[in-house]
């Protein structure tokens, strides 16, 4: 009994000092908050993440080689949030955002806040101010590699300033992490890959900006281009693989494959075919795809074309997939993602 009285006294003192709700039992009914998520624009990736999308109030890192689809994935997430009335911001440290492409992905440019800062300190100060406002749902920083410290910009070309960017990121994340959680704002950091020199064993790849982001991120996505999508001889898109390298919300290390079409973003038709086959909703016999005894086409690209021309059927398959999402998730995650019909795509 002495322990329980001492605990009650300590809890009441904490609540008097820091306010009601500053400490509570995790299982208490009023303390458990459902995690809000935002879709990535890819149903397969939403399933692989285990919670139906990317979590709000958390730090997300998307990294990969050049032209792998990092910014596309971030912009699609912004478009999905805007569809639900969310306010989004984009800190364009690379000064390379293409508004025409963003609009094609479904981003509402009139309601997208954009900043093109001069230095890393300015970018992170803007990020901190927007997060603390509590009015932003998603904030994208593109990219960590472009967050150049002021001292480096003002210095001479060739000056050696080791660890300065890592210290900048570490300090910023220490400040940001609490306000991100309180404001329920999702902050997506896009990052690039560098090679470590002299690595004999293991992967020589690393991300820029030091180790702080790896620790603070709740979800880390590794996105890679694994092939091309062709129509006859013309390349019209990339086959992309995303691996959930870190996930604090659900089991990690799941991976998913989908097509990113040039000027369109993630190919929902191709992805729904892959997921439908995996779940047994779409039948595949040889090269033919069919749904409810109706033939969709011979080869994956022809099936995609048929579904694009028949949006009602596409919606029907998507609804069936969403209704069976739990069953799909189990089978899908066990097998590590939808099968890639790269050979068929290349033959079309």
UniProtKB/Swiss-Prot annotation:
PROSITE patterns found in the cross-reference section: RECA_1 (PS00321), RECA_2 (PS50162), RECA_3 (PS50163)
User: Where would you find this protein in the cell?
Assistant: Cytoplasm
Among the GO molecular function terms of this UniProt record, one is: ATP hydrolysis activity
Could you tell me which InterPro entries the record lists for this protein?
AAA+_ATPase, DNA_recomb/repair_RecA, DNA_recomb/repair_RecA_CS, P-loop_NTPase, RecA-like_C, RecA-like_N, RecA_ATP-bd, RecA_C_sf
An individual GO BP term: SOS response
GO CC annotation terms, alphabetical: cytosol
Q: Which UniProt keywords apply?
A: ATP-binding, Cytoplasm, DNA damage, DNA recombination, DNA repair, DNA-binding, Nucleotide-binding, SOS response
A Pfam family this chain is assigned to: RecA
Transmembrane intervals: none
Residues given in the record as ATP binding sites: 64-71
Q: What is the name attached to this protein's record?
A: Protein RecA
What species is this protein from? Rhizobium meliloti (strain 1021)
Phylogenetic placement of the source organism: Bacteria, Pseudomonadati, Pseudomonadota, Alphaproteobacteria, Hyphomicrobiales
From the UniProt record, report the name of the gene that encodes this protein.
recA
């Amino acid at each position: 009994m002495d322990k329980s009285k001492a605990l009650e006294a300590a809890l009441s003192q904490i609540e008097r000092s820091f306010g009601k709700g500053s400490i509570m039992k995790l299982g208490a009914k009023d303390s458990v908050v459902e995690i809000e998520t935002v879709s990535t624009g890819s149903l397969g990736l939403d399933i692989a993440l285990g919670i139906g999308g990317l979590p709000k109030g958390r730090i997300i890192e998307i990294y990969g080689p050049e032209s792998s689809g990092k910014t596309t994935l971030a912009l699609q997430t912004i478009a999905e949030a805007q569809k639900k009335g969310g306010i989004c911001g984009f800190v364009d440290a690379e000064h390379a955002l293409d508004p025409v492409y963003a609009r094609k992905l479904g981003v509402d440019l009139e309601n997208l806040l954009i900043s093109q800062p001069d230095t890393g300190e300015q970018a992170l100060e803007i990020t901190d101010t927007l997060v603390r406002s509590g009015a932003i749902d998603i904030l994208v920083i593109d990219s960590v590699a472009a967050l150049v410290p002021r001292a480096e910009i003002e210095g001479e070309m060739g000056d050696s300033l080791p660890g300065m960017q890592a210290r900048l990121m570490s300090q910023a994340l220490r400040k940001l992490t609490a306000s991100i959680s309180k404001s329920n704002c999702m902050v997506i950091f896009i990052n690039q890959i560098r090679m470590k020199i002299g690595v004999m064993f293991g992967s020589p790849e690393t991300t820029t900006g030091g180790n702080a982001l790896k620790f603070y991120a709740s979800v880390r996505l590794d996105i890679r281009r694994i092939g091309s999508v062709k129509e006859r001889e013309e390349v019209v898109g990339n086959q992309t693989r995303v691996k959930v390298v870190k996930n604090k919300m659900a089991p990690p290390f799941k991976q998913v494959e989908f097509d990113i079409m040039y000027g369109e973003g993630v190919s929902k038709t191709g992805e729904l075919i892959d997921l439908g086959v995996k779940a047994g909703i779409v039948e595949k016999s040889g090269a033919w795809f069919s749904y409810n005894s109706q033939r969709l086409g011979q080869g994956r690209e022809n099936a995609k074309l048929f579904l694009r021309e028949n949006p009602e059927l596409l919606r029907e398959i998507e609804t069936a997939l969403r209704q069976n999402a739990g069953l799909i998730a189990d089978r899908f995650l066990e097998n590590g993602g939808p099968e890639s019909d790269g050979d068929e795509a290349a033959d079309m």
